Amino acid sequence: QRYALINGIIAPFRAPKSAKVYKQLWTERGSPLLFHGLDLQKKLQAALGNGYHVAFGMRYQSPSIKSALEELQEQSVDRIIVLPLFPQYASASTGSVQDKVMDIVKDWWVIPSINFISSFCDDPGFIKAFAELGKQHMAQDNYDHVIFSYHGLPERQVLKGSDKGYCQLGACCNTYNKRNKYCYRASCFATSRLLAAELGLREDQYTVTFQSRLLKDP
């Protein structure tokens, strides 16, 4: 059903418009997603040193997750740490990467220890880095209000991310704890609160929103 929706309805209508928009994002180095990813790989490798081997792979593009894992396999590593670059956990994003990794390594004769970093939405280093970017933009102009906009998810997926009966799509997201640590909505609000604090924003100076081209999808 998802395949038919994306390939039969969404892609044919969206592709021409998307291609025009993405072309505007291209630089002399090519795709920002690719070269920023490779830059991150190199910087992380330099920071970790020769005791680690950092590989970079993407879920739907090249280099692929499969090629990254094969690169690590050739190094005969004892342990693999998988870090999907999604700050907030969602089954459709982070979970999809985890599923892909396990689907690939299940065919290996020797499977090393594998650890997943499922979320880093409240990591101090992440918050500080993003806040620094925000400060640079805010210093260029006076903003009356800041909007934190996140990719939207169907409510049915959000409800599955918390302990049964805990998520009410409301006040339950005012705190971030072990009962809702995998709730995408609660994670986004947690990130926003921490960023707002780092940026010196009062509660009435920012808004958290969710956007999707599919409009309402329960």
Can you annotate each of these PLM segments?
Residues 1-218:
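Active-site-proximal alpha-helix that buttresses catalytic centers in soluble enzyme cores
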